[in-house]
């Protein structure tokens, strides 16, 4: 099954865990042996962290592959994939490492397995420096399913920094091929809704204050829509540890979804958390794109694998997206074109079209 070995420099561009996720997923799918060097070389703690290690081990187990150099602090790994298999797969970051990032690396792979898969993922569900599980379910899921597959995400327990302890179960069936997507029409915002949560010992008032501050902030800019942010106390048996946060979603007439989110930290008042999420949402609505800045890079691997030409309209192209494109071109040989949007209404905005000629990956098992 092995093709020529792909050599990846883990220190370029985004220079972090994302390079590992994109390169190992594509290596696994395409059956290409991989060596990644200089892993997280520029970070304050270089090399693999626990959450990267659990992602690598999961990919190895998904395809009965061989993995060398995979230990905490290691800056070089080699990976030799074999055949992707369905069934039950488990990954545990043993920290507050993000379950959503584990989904990012494993999901494209199990779409091309021989049978349905069940992914048991343990770690942080609402963690810093990663999508919150609510974002994954409320924004990522409905958009990524346009590629022609569906998945189910069951949140068993929520887990927060620093303990983790969350668990989600993702169920999905394989596909023959992925359809290309065309997301270029923004439409107008028709709904704004969200949830502000507290868990553990934090008082419910914190959730109400986050929600109220976010609503006030949004109203300054968008006056004609009801903003429905529900304050939520997470049930004791469904949350591990203490945490608070908020996610706000804007939905448009064409089915586009944008989000702003924020997590509470010790010593940061609730209003500030709510306002930060609201401002992030408003910033994502100001450009003429059809996806927000966090969805951009999560769609690149699927666009690269799809059978045909995909197009998405975005605001400024993030470093994560540029990095994902770089490795999708290097490893999968997909062809991307990024150009400024030529639409009249986008003229004054920083709006781009990302176009990809996908490789038409076909599931050999179906």
From Swiss-Prot:
Pfam families: RTC, RTC_insert. Ubiquitous. It is found in: Nucleus, Nucleoplasm. The keyword Nucleotide-binding applies. It catalyses: a 3'-end 3'-phospho-ribonucleotide-RNA + ATP = a 3'-end 2',3'-cyclophospho-ribonucleotide-RNA + AMP + diphosphate. The keyword Nucleus applies. One of its GO terms (cellular component) is nucleus. Its EC number is 6.5.1.4. One of its GO terms (biological process) is negative regulation of optical nerve axon regeneration. The active site is at residue 320. Its main location: nucleus. Keywords: ATP-binding, Ligase, Nucleotide-binding, Nucleus. GO terms for molecular function: ATP binding; RNA binding; RNA-3'-phosphate cyclase activity. ATP binds at residues 104, 131, 294, 297-298, 320. PANTHER family: RNA 3' TERMINAL PHOSPHATE CYCLASE, RNA 3'-TERMINAL PHOSPHATE CYCLASE. Belongs to the RNA 3'-terminal cyclase family. Type 1 subfamily. Catalyzes the conversion of 3'-phosphate to a 2',3'-cyclic phosphodiester at the end of RNA. The mechanism of action of the enzyme occurs in 3 steps: (A) adenylation of the enzyme by ATP; (B) transfer of adenylate to an RNA-N3'P to produce RNA-N3'PP5'A; (C) and attack of the adjacent 2'-hydroxyl on the 3'-phosphorus in the diester linkage to produce the cyclic end product. Likely functions in some aspects of cellular RNA processing. Function plays an important role in regulating axon regeneration by inhibiting central nervous system (CNS) axon regeneration following optic nerve injury. This is RNA 3'-terminal phosphate cyclase. The lineage of its organism: Eukaryota, Metazoa, Chordata, Craniata, Vertebrata.
């Amino acid at each position: 099954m092995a093709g020529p070995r792909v050599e990846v420099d883990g220190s370029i561009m985004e220079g972090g865990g994302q390079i590992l996720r994109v390169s190992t997923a594509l290596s696994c799918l395409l059956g290409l042996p991989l060596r990644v060097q200089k892993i997280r070389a520029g970070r304050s703690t270089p090399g693999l962290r626990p959450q990267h290690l659990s992602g690598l081990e999961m990919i190895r187990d998904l395809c009965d592959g061989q993995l060398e150099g995979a230990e905490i602090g290691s800056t070089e790994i080699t990976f030799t994939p074999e055949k992707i298999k369905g069934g039950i797969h488990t990954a545990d970051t043993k920290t507050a490492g993000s379950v959503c990032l584990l989904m990012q690396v494993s999901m494209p792979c199990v779409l091309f397995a021989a049978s349905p898969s069940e992914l048991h993922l343990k770690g942080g569900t609402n963690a810093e420096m990663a999508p919150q599980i609510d974002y994954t379910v409320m924004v990522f899921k409905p958009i990524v399913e346009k590629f022609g597959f569906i998945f189910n995400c069951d949140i068993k327990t929520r887990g927060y920094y620093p303990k983790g302890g969350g668990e989600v179960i993702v169920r999905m069936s394989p596909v023959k091929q992925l359809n290309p997507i065309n997301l270029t029409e923004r439409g107008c915002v028709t709904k704004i809704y969200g949830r502000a949560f507290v868990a553990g010992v934090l008082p419910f008032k914190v959730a109400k204050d986050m929600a109220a501050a976010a609503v006030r902030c949004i109203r300054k800019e968008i006056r004609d829509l009801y903003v429905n942010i529900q304050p939520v106390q997470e049930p004791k048996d469904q949350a591990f540890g203490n945490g608070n946060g908020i996610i706000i979603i804007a939905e448009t007439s064409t089915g586009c979804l944008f989000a702003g989110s924020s997590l509470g930290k010790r010593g940061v008042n609730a209003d500030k958390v709510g306002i930060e999420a609201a401002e992030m949402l408003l910033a994502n609505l100001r450009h003429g794109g059809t996806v927000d800045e966090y969805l951009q890079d999560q769609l690149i691997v699927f666009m690269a694998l799809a059978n045909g030409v995909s197009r998405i309209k975005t605001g400024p192209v993030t470093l994560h997206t540029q990095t994902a494109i770089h490795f999708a071109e290097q490893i999968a040989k997909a062809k991307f074109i990024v150009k400024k949007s030529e639409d009249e209404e986008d003229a004054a905005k920083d709006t781009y079209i990302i176009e990809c000629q996908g490789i038409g990956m076909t599931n050999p098992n179906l």
